[in-house]
Amino acid sequence: NASTVNVTASAAGPTVTLAQLTAGIAPSPLVASTTDKAILGFSATSSAGTPSMTAFNIGTSTTSVSKLTNVKLYTSTDNSYATAGDNVQITGFAFAQTATQLQFSALTEALSTSAKYYFIVADIDATVTGATVAVQPSLTNANVTVSSGSVTGGTITGTNYAFDVAAGT
């Protein structure tokens, strides 16, 4: 008597968990013509294996165009952008700034079971004033792409940044 057993294997892959970082993040307001201001930070940790983070999109509450310029991505060995000497700029990926997003793609960021720390850093346009409409960055797990598995952690909501002119102007 032969019997057949059907086995369904699940290859869900690892879970990548995002968490917000607040140490070293710039306070509001952002001042015209200032540089290298960390506007959002997050960590990414894999439950197993080494999936790659290949893309993510930071949403903005209003357009960041003509407010945030020279946007960069940094990684750090600790969870603070303020710590001197341990922040390294990531290069070699594609970046686009739209009316509602900061889009990072073609990334090859290997993740692991140890948290990896990321900071979105920008210069502040010289033309912003106290009348410039505020902008608030955010990151949802749905806007993060990994090579395998899934992403969890909810929404990371940054500071609602007002703007101001440089002191003495």
Show the residue positions of the predicted features:
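Exposed, polar/acidic Ser/Thr-rich sequence context and nearby capping/turn residues
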Residues: N1-T169
